[in-house]
Amino acid sequence: MFYRYPINDVHIHLFDPKDIDECIAMVDECGYTNWTFLACTVIDSPFALAQNLLCALMKLKEGGRCQAFGSFHYNGDVVPDADDLLRQIQWFDQAGFDGIKMLDGKPGVRRRQNLRLDAPNYDKMFDYAQRTQFPI
């Protein structure tokens, strides 16, 4: 009974582009029919800036099997202002991403950013997401 159906509730973080083929091979071997790539731009890594590009690439390579959830860009740990976050979420939506992996609510990230999730910085972005039903 437990292994009769394929596992579909899975997300993957991929940090180095050289691991793309290995990631796809793992997805195939595990029998995932759908999976989600969650970009992570707040990592302390030279690959942080390329996370959203890698996320979009995996969505294209996987031909509909991979959902792409982008990640907001920050200036260090400073949360962008409301207009910048609005521009970012609109771009993700228009570029074909399936949603946002909003890392701001994770305890460690939130501690570094020192900003509550109900701060005005997020208002326009949350309004857009709610109005368009763009997943966060």
Q: Where are each of the predicted segments found?
A:
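An N-terminally biased module of ancient metal coordination in phosphate/nucleic-acid-related enzymes
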Residues: 1-65
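Active-site gating/metal-coordination segments in enzymes
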Residues: 49-136
